[in-house]
From Swiss-Prot:
The keyword Transit peptide applies. GO terms for cellular component: chloroplast. SUPFAM superfamilies: RuBisCO, small subunit. Its main location: plastid. HAMAP family: RuBisCO_S_bact. It comes from Acetabularia acetabulum (Mermaid's wine glass). The basic functional RuBisCO is composed of a large chain homodimer in a 'head-to-tail' conformation. In form I RuBisCO this homodimer is arranged in a barrel-like tetramer with the small subunits forming a tetrameric 'cap' on each end of the 'barrel'. This is Ribulose bisphosphate carboxylase small subunit, chloroplastic 1. The lineage of its organism: Eukaryota, Viridiplantae, Chlorophyta, Ulvophyceae, TCBD clade.
């Protein structure tokens, strides 16, 4: 057995000993060096302006109703309690103006910002269509607000997940995935 392992390690080391190919470097119009990687948009700079993110899935394009429905089904399958929250555009992101600070330490809630709860948490909800109808009602009542769906685990007494289900049409702080890099 030891000799077989020894032979494999020798073979691996011979394969790894091959010299790496150096990338072809060319100069672009401005005189900067470019490689194949930069031409393929693999080495890009993150756009720091108007590119704010929220919780889970915020790096993706806005979720469709079907995708939200699948997430709701997953939440209900795991016996978690869904809850809708909404916030105005100026209160949606964490900041000194809208965070509750308790002395030198922050509160223990997720990211120190509290959104307004839409009705009560949906305790005992077993049908995903109920959650989707509440999302539609909240969107109709507050069309220019951010709306997120969070879910809580009653056994562990923690928030399990949270993601946006509605971004206001007037939001200018979001970029499509193709525009997030320079």
């Amino acid at each position: 057995m030891a000799s077989i392992m020894m032979n494999k390690s020798v073979v691996l080391s011979k394969e790894c000993a091959k010299p790496l190919a150096t990338p072809k470097v060319t100069l672009n119009k401005r005189g900067f060096a470019t490689t194949i990687a930069t031409k393929n948009r693999e080495m890009m700079v993150w756009q720091p302006f108007n590119n704010k993110m929220f919780e889970t899935f915020s790096f993706l394009p806005p979720l469709t109703d079907e995708q939200i429905s699948k997430q709701v089904d997953y939440i209900l399958t795991n016996s978690w309690t869904p809850c809708l929250e909404f916030a105005a555009s100026d209160q949606a992101y964490a900041g000194n103006e809208n965070c509750i600070r308790m002395g030198p330490v922050a509160s223990t809630y997720q990211d120190n910002r509290y959104w307004t709860m839409w009705k009560l948490p949906m305790f005992g909800c077993t049908d995903g269509s109920q959650v989707l109808s509440e999302i539609q009602a909240c969107t109709k009542a507050f069309p220019d607000a951010y709306i997120r769906l969070v879910c809580f685990d009653a056994n562990r007494q923690v928030q399990i997940s949270g993601f946006l289900v509605h971004r206001p049409p007037s939001a200018t702080d979001y970029r499509l995935p193709a525009d997030r890099q320079v």
